[in-house]
Amino acid sequence: MDTDKKSDFFPRSSVAIRTRVAWRAGYLLAAFGIYMADQASKAWAVRALRFGEERVVIPGFFQFIYTENPGIAFGQLQEGGSFGRWFFVVLAVLAVIAVFYYFMRTPRNDDRVLGACALLLAGISGNLTDRARLGYVIDFIVLHAGNFHWPTFNIADASITIGALLLAYDLIFSHRSTRINADLKDVS
């Protein structure tokens, strides 16, 4: 039985199920490691920065400042109250389910997409944990250069951003290269 077929998402045998999950285990372990790093770094931020302390890492470029973000990315939609909190929790749960489904359907040789999905799973889960537990997401990493100031973020946000960029790159360029290769085969 070929477990890479997209139509075979639910394999019939337990061997096929173990095979399908086994080779993805490394990606899931990496996602779990990123999730744990995110949660540990947020716990550090609460202890070290919560009462207004700033830590400058590289003057004029990189520092840590504790913030609580009840909204979504870059502080948008912060006025949702309790409804907004649970709306974002449900949205994040649906996103985790969708990404995991896509992850399980991705062929084993598609490392970029599998890695992107692992990053997305780690990041979404990290922020979901904060939002469900606290009602907000802990952000503390600040990057700036001159007048440019990137919104405060955390490891989960970075994971989501990198995963989304990898997935977008794959969606844009892999189909293009597949089309080019198909066109070259037609010509020859």
Residue positions per predicted region:
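Alpha-helical transmembrane bundles and membrane-interface segments of multipass inner-membrane proteins
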Residues: 2-188
